[in-house]
Amino acid sequence: MSIFNENIVELVKENRFFRQEIATNPHSQLVLMSVEPGDDIGDETHAVDQVLFFVSGSGEAVLDQKRSPIAANSLVLVPAGTRHNFINTGDTPLKLFSVYAPAEHAPGTSHKSKADAVAAEKEHHVLNR
């Protein structure tokens, strides 16, 4: 079990990785993300709930094809089974943390770039067929 008591805003601001798993427990997982200007998280659907808190930057949330703006201090709840994407429409990285319940990624997951994350997801799906 991971116990976490840190300044999450500072950790998010310092994060340079597209995806960085910070803590994983049996029923939840904490992940930091940094999305470059003009990029997105990627259209996806999870079998778990996801809560995203945006620390800095600006963009657009797309939940089941409905678009809405996001900015610093936005919180978005994505229920399991909801198709979603988050797009950075600003000029600076979109910085956020995400809580999955239960965990979505393997403990220790770290992707320097979105391309690394996409490649890892493809490998994961091939291995788990």
What are these regions (language model features)?
Residues 66-80:
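Short acidic-glycine-tyrosine-enriched beta hairpin
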Residues 26-28, 37, 47, 66, ...:
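A generic "binding-loop/recognition-motif" signal
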Residues 80-106:
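Ligand-binding loop in jelly-roll beta-barrel domains
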Residues 40-41, 60, 76, 80-86:
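Histidine-centered metal-chelating micro-motifs
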Residues 16, 31-45:
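Conserved short histidine dyad/triad with adjacent acidic residue
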Residues 34-36, 46-61, 99:
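Short, conserved beta-strand element in jelly-roll/cupin
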Residues 26-28, 37-39, 58-60, 102-106:
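Short, charged/polar surface micro-motifs in flexible loops or helix N-caps
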Residues 1-27, 111-129:
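A short, N-terminal "cap"/entry segment at the start of jelly-roll beta-barrel domains
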